[in-house]
Amino acid sequence: MQIAMVGLGRMGANMVRRLIKAGHECVVYDVSAENVAALEKEGAIGAGSMAEMIGKLEAPRAVWLMLPAAITGKIAREVAGHLQPGDTIIDLSLI
């Protein structure tokens, strides 16, 4: 399965590692380019923007959010603006 992860803090990064270990293809995005680069070294596909991340996914797309509460709504709306019917947002942000 191909899945995107937005938010590569401790929880998001560890989830990406588990998904990769289980054989999933992960496309990752974070405001910290360092966090993206670290996971690229572990097998993830990095993206420098939300649009680039979505563009690297095949339909139907699945985007997982692992974000702090303060920005969850804003980022969820931004992601939704790039998606089509049939795509999925998985929100496990801290609220």
Where are these regions (language model features)?
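NAD(P)+-binding Rossmann beta1-loop-alpha1 motif at the extreme N-terminus of oxidoreductases
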Residues: 1-62, 82-88, 92-93
